[in-house]
Each structure stands twice: as structure tokens, then as C-alpha cells.
């Protein structure tokens, strides 16, 4: 394949116009593309193509041998420090195809970072750099082609200065085949074993970039947050999550509820495959200056068996969206540990909930779908939607940085290191690729060889980065390695003893004053002649503990690890302890402190530490008419992680419906009036008053006047009878008046005003009533005059028929 492509590139160089030092003109590129088929690989530099070096690599996340049709995979093109590249081209071809036709290409790429990568204008299926500048890593997503495509070859070309690195087999080519029934049991787990020695300790730092400024569409202002980070360092036999796989119950609870409890339980059940459980606090809100100054971090360790790390955290609120790393390999091919990993993250869907917006109601996905990265074309209501299909803006960045190495280091160097050094051209060996924006100290002297025997090892020198003037330009590593041979051969007896490395020094034998410490090594291989090894296997040296000894001194252990901070947010205290190994010789009390405490600072406390569901609809009004109350509720989706949840879970408000009907309301009936005639047949009446008029369709008022018949003595006939009745009536009135005058004289404290005039008749005909009143003028306070009260009289009027 390489032999066929080299003449193609030479023909391209020969046919084009004169080239500038750094690239082709756009016109030349267009002509070259049209002359050589649908999509030829066009390199943007001048020079001879060379085989790819091992410092450049093309990697599919998880290093799978098989792909699942339709699944998405993260593809990384990287350069090992201090190498770098300025330009690149990345394509995916069906095995055996040249790429001259559109149907030769397999699968589709998805841009992650538009500032780093773009599709080629003259070859839309290929990915290239956005701008020609120094870089050490680019990433894209590749979606596998449909069933029946067969094997696919991912190929990359690298441009560095005037030298073109191009390789069709090796580190810049990745062959991956379709998973069929025969390979269905094969997973996408990494298959390469780690050859590094000892353990390495790393710090994970998480920088959230999701904010209203970067992602304004439907941004949840009050409830935005990152859930607690959960993950582990693990072996290739355990998978926390992966693209194309199904979410476990633990992943589901992180994705939907932000709860890491079940996920941690699942991790701890894999005790043989897990070295460290990785945990970091949640962030409320998702972005603030504190998250940049003191970003959430966690430390973890890896070893030869458990050299992968995975983690995830929920982007909340959301249906089931997360970010994270899956099976990130921290072991290098040259049996070392990666110094630093920087990964930009975009959200992915756990496949357990079908919501499309941040605060969509719960809608379980049945059946459950596979984990996949979100895209800008998923749904028009999605906050990441882009009708043009652009890339999703990054929501977070994670940095993995090696902070310590422990245990034995490898006593060998891979054979290909000598080949790599010898293969470099002389001018490349001497050339310093250090950018002008990176200011270093001088190199330190070379260290002793890592091998203590007659084996191949390596030695190291270091320098210090004093200043980085341009943060966008990466600075090369501060360490340099060189192959060497160890001094482990014994010349005294003509035989060879193979020795191990020295074990770590023991603690000092005393807790005060001067003592000793020792270290050991062992014989890995005795001489063939059966003689004894004369190489020392133990070393002892003096050690001094600063504190002077006295008879009252006591022997104590080393300090233990610090306890966790007493506060989950804000300022708290942390403590560590040690124990007394031996009491003072003089029998006194040991004055050494066995507990030490100091302040610790956790992420800033926030007022919204819990995740709530959206408000429900308002209930019906509590009444059917008039004024009432209605309520709505919401649920606590996940427990508070930084304190109690003080948010209200129920709200109430007033509601108003049409006015209720008001029925007519009347007073009680009055007493019957006197008969309206002095003799013969007549009638009496009684009345009642309207207290409340009917309203809003209430019951109408019934009658307010009732009349009944009455009969007085028979009327006497003749002219003298009328005169007699009038006289009797007059005498009666005089008698009543005289009685009243006597009462007033006997009880002068009860005085009444004169009768008022009669009121107007209540009706014009048919019998009405008139009223008059006598009001009390002066009333005694004594209880024996309680009969002294206002008086009222009624009489009939307008009794003629209507």
C-alpha cells in the first residue's frame, strides 16, 4: 500500500505550482484533488514522505479489534512529548480501497473541537486541522458504518515542519473489523498488557465549562450543577461504561438522579479488578470562579494490572446526560506511566430516559438504548440543537496528572528505543524544538542507571519550566531519558550476580536523636559456577530525628493519613493520629502529641444542594364558586449532598371562581295588627322585612305581608249607635292617657317621647300597614324598670281592593 501511494504523492508534487515553505495554495489543492480522483490525501508541506515514528500514534478509545455497526468511537491522534505536529489528515477507508471514490470511505467523523479540527473542503469525508500550528493531540468521534461493510482502515498523515510523516502500517494506521456472530463474544476492552513496574499516583482535576454564557439555550439558572464524580482505576476485565454498551443500574442512577451510591457499590463489588475508588464532591452551581481556582479533584493510583481509569458525572438537571472518561490507559508502550492527560469532554446519553430538554419530565426509554454521544441534530428542542449540524461546544475538561511513583522501576528498556535514537537524522538530534514561549532552566546531570545489574536500563535528567509565555502553545516535557547499562557485574570472582533493586529505606529506629535505618535487596540469579554472591544485600545508614532525647522522651509511630475534612463545604477541620510505641524511661507521662488538627477548605457552600423535579400542575380550586385555594407540588429527586434541602416542596395560592348565588334572607314575622274595624268583619295584617336581597341567581324573596280575617262584635243599627261608639272610643282614649300620666308620675325616671307621625302606607291598595314609634326619653338604670322601652304601633291602611 505504501509503495503505491508514494508515487501518487510525488506526482502531486511534480504537477503543482512552486510550493511555499509551509503549504500548498488553495488553487493547487483544488487542482490536485480533481486530477487524482474523488478524495486524495493532500499534505500541506514540502518534503519527502517518511515512515511514521513511534512518537506519533493513532488510537481508537479502548483499542478495540472489532466495531459494532452504528456505534460511535473516540479517535485520538497524538504526539508523545516533546514531539508535536502542525498539520494532519485523517480518513477511514474500506479495506483494500484507495479512496478515489466516495463509496471507498467507511463511517462518518464528527468534529469535537472546531478550533482544532475541520472537514477538508475538497474532501468532506476527511478531517484536517483548522489552523496550522503546533499541537500534540486532536480528537474526533467516528461512527462505524452499517452492517456488511467489513474491515475498516483508519489512516493518518502527519505534517511537522518540512518533514512529512506518512505511514500505511504501524502507529498511524488502525485496522478494525466488523463484529459478526463469530466475534460477538469479543468486547471492545483493551487487549494490550501493561509492562510498567511499581505503582503511579495521579490527580484528577475536573474543570466545568457549562454555563449560561457558553450554552445559553434553555439554560437552567437555578438548578444547574455537576453531580458528585464517581469512578475507579481498574483492570481491562471491568468496564464502568463505554460507548455502544448498556448503562448498568449504577450508571443509570448517576445519569438520572446524580446519585453515586449504587455506582460505588458496583465498583466495590469488583474488588479484585479495582485499585482505587475515585470520588469528588458535586458542584453547585455548575460554573463559578471557585470552580476554576479550586476545581474539584481526587487522587488515585494505578499498577500494572489495574492501569485503566474511568469516571462519570451527571450534567444536571438533565434526562440522563453525563460526561466522563472510559478505560483511559495510563500505561505507556515503553513500560512507563503517562505524565499528563488533558481531555475535553462533550455530553453523552446513557440511553435510559427519552427526555430532550434539561428539565423534561421522566420518560423511561423502553427498551433501554445504548450509550452514545449527544449530537447537535438529536432533537429540535434539545439545548444543543444546531440545524446545520455543527459540533457541540465543550462542556468540561479533565486533567490527569502524575504526581508520584512508588515501588520498583523497570530494569529494562524496550529494544526499539535504541532503534528510535539511531533512526533520527543528525540534524534532528541536535535541533531543539523548544518553543520560544517556554523558558527552562539548564538540564541537570544524568542520574545513575536504573539497572543495578548487567542489564539494560535507562537514566534521566531534568529541567525546570520557569515560565510559559503563551498558554496555547504546549511546552515539552521537563524530563529526558537515555538508555544505559547497569553496573551490576561483580569482577572480583569472575562470576555474575543478578540483583534486584533496593527496597525502600525502613523508618528510623528512634523517635528522637540519632538512630539507624536500613534497606535490602535480594539475589535474582546466582552465578552459574555455584559460587556465593559477594555483592552486599543490605545497607545501613545513620538517621537523625530533630528532637533531642531525654529520659522523659517516648517512642511514637509515624503520623497516619489525614482524616476527611469535617465539613462537606466551606471551612472545616481534619485530623491525623499516631500511637505511643514506648513510654518514657523515667516513668513520666508521654508529652508527645498523638493527635494533630488543622483547617481544611472545601468547595463553597451553596443554597441549592438538592435536585428537585419540576412543579406539578395546579390543583382544582378548593371551592365550586367564589374565593378558594389551589396547590401544586414537586418531588425531591436526589438527597442533598452539601447540606439539608431547604427548598419548599408545596406551594398554595388563592383562586377565584364565579360568585356563589345569594338567597333572599328575611326577618321574622311581626305581631298581627289590630282588626281594621271596630265592629263586624275586618282583617288583620303582619309583615316581615328583607334583610338580604337575592344576588347571582339566588332564591327570590317570598311575600312580606300576610292578611287574615277578624271579626269584632256585631255592629248596632240606627243613628244613635254610631254616636255611642264614637263616645266610647273617646272615653277609652282618655282613660289610657290618664293611666299613662299616672305611670309617669309614679315612675318619673321612665319618660317617653310623644308618638311619631304614621309612616306612609306600604301599599297603594289591597291592604298595607303604617307604623309609628314612641321612643324612650329617659330610662332608669334600676333593674325594676326594665319594662321601660321603645314602643311601636301598627295599623292597616289602603284596605280597598286594587
Curated annotation (Swiss-Prot):
<feature type="disulfide bond">
    <location>
        <begin position="197"/>
        <end position="410"/>
    </location>
</feature>
<keyword id="KW-0479">Metal-binding</keyword>
<keyword id="KW-0130">Cell adhesion</keyword>
<dbReference type="Pfam" id="PF00090">
    <property type="entry name" value="TSP_1"/>
</dbReference>
<feature type="domain" description="TSP type-1 2">
    <location>
        <begin position="496"/>
        <end position="550"/>
    </location>
</feature>
<feature type="glycosylation site" description="N-linked (GlcNAc...) asparagine">
    <location>
        <position position="676"/>
    </location>
</feature>
<dbReference type="InterPro" id="IPR038678">
    <property type="entry name" value="Spondin_N_sf"/>
</dbReference>
<feature type="disulfide bond">
    <location>
        <begin position="151"/>
        <end position="177"/>
    </location>
</feature>
<feature type="domain" description="TSP type-1 3">
    <location>
        <begin position="553"/>
        <end position="606"/>
    </location>
</feature>
<dbReference type="GO" id="GO:0007155">
    <property type="term" value="P:cell adhesion"/>
</dbReference>
<feature type="disulfide bond">
    <location>
        <begin position="497"/>
        <end position="533"/>
    </location>
</feature>
<feature type="disulfide bond">
    <location>
        <begin position="195"/>
        <end position="335"/>
    </location>
</feature>
<dbReference type="InterPro" id="IPR009465">
    <property type="entry name" value="Spondin_N"/>
</dbReference>
<feature type="disulfide bond">
    <location>
        <begin position="621"/>
        <end position="625"/>
    </location>
</feature>
<feature type="domain" description="Reelin">
    <location>
        <begin position="24"/>
        <end position="189"/>
    </location>
</feature>
<feature type="domain" description="TSP type-1 6">
    <location>
        <begin position="749"/>
        <end position="801"/>
    </location>
</feature>
<feature type="domain" description="TSP type-1 1">
    <location>
        <begin position="437"/>
        <end position="490"/>
    </location>
</feature>
<feature type="binding site">
    <location>
        <position position="320"/>
    </location>
    <ligand>
        <name>Ca(2+)</name>
    </ligand>
</feature>
<keyword id="KW-0677">Repeat</keyword>
<feature type="disulfide bond">
    <location>
        <begin position="454"/>
        <end position="489"/>
    </location>
</feature>
<keyword id="KW-0964">Secreted</keyword>
<dbReference type="InterPro" id="IPR000884">
    <property type="entry name" value="TSP1_rpt"/>
</dbReference>
<keyword id="KW-0272">Extracellular matrix</keyword>
<feature type="disulfide bond">
    <location>
        <begin position="543"/>
        <end position="549"/>
    </location>
</feature>
<feature type="disulfide bond">
    <location>
        <begin position="438"/>
        <end position="475"/>
    </location>
</feature>
<feature type="disulfide bond">
    <location>
        <begin position="655"/>
        <end position="660"/>
    </location>
</feature>
<feature type="glycosylation site" description="N-linked (GlcNAc...) asparagine">
    <location>
        <position position="209"/>
    </location>
</feature>
<feature type="binding site">
    <location>
        <position position="349"/>
    </location>
    <ligand>
        <name>Ca(2+)</name>
    </ligand>
</feature>
<feature type="disulfide bond">
    <location>
        <begin position="39"/>
        <end position="123"/>
    </location>
</feature>
<feature type="binding site">
    <location>
        <position position="353"/>
    </location>
    <ligand>
        <name>Ca(2+)</name>
    </ligand>
</feature>
<feature type="domain" description="TSP type-1 4">
    <location>
        <begin position="609"/>
        <end position="661"/>
    </location>
</feature>
<dbReference type="InterPro" id="IPR042307">
    <property type="entry name" value="Reeler_sf"/>
</dbReference>
<feature type="disulfide bond">
    <location>
        <begin position="508"/>
        <end position="512"/>
    </location>
</feature>
<dbReference type="InterPro" id="IPR036383">
    <property type="entry name" value="TSP1_rpt_sf"/>
</dbReference>
<dbReference type="Pfam" id="PF06468">
    <property type="entry name" value="Spond_N"/>
</dbReference>
<feature type="domain" description="TSP type-1 5">
    <location>
        <begin position="663"/>
        <end position="716"/>
    </location>
</feature>
<dbReference type="GO" id="GO:0005576">
    <property type="term" value="C:extracellular region"/>
</dbReference>
<dbReference type="InterPro" id="IPR051418">
    <property type="entry name" value="Spondin/Thrombospondin_T1"/>
</dbReference>
<keyword id="KW-0325">Glycoprotein</keyword>
<dbReference type="GO" id="GO:0031012">
    <property type="term" value="C:extracellular matrix"/>
</dbReference>
<dbReference type="GO" id="GO:0046872">
    <property type="term" value="F:metal ion binding"/>
</dbReference>
<feature type="disulfide bond">
    <location>
        <begin position="449"/>
        <end position="484"/>
    </location>
</feature>
